[in-house]
Amino acid sequence: MTAWIKLISESDATGTLRDMYEQAQTPHGTVDNVMKAHSLRPHTMQGHIALYRSVLHHPDITLPLWFLEVIASYTSIKNNCSYSLTHHFMNARRLLNDEERADNIYAALLEGCPERAFSGKELAFLIYAAKLTLDVGDMEKRDVDLLHEAGCSDGEILEVNQVTAYFNYSNRLLNGLGVTTEGDAVGYYKASGEETS
């Protein structure tokens, strides 16, 4: 079972849904279950695709993409969303292209101890993402002041804020509908040496 509600397959998609599936294709040429979860209301997929691509795949992003994938993964850990963690830590791992470092980061995040793998502004961003995820009602100006003190620019803060906010949305979509990775090609990026479709 890939979800607790009906998901319309790519082969059964017609009209607007078929068009949305074409827009949602990954570099693997597949449509992940996170997008298929919208299949009964394809208009909601359009907004999801636009938001996802704007926070993780836009050319004006300044922070390293591997690190934004780490933010996505840490947010997903805090929300206990195995779907997003599976996909997005695979992305971080492929972008890092350093298995030992990726393993160390993954262990530190799972243990809730990002300071074991990060320092400086990267650590400050992870602390911010965790608080925004778990204690959103307690956010205050001081949280942003701490990011400034760590050397983060306002634009970088916005990038991390948007990735964290997006994954809080996506994690709730996935966990709330019981969406699994069954049938997905895990990760957005091809593995080193893997041919693009």
Explain the meaning of each model-derived region:
Residues 1-197:
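Hydrophobic alpha-helical segments
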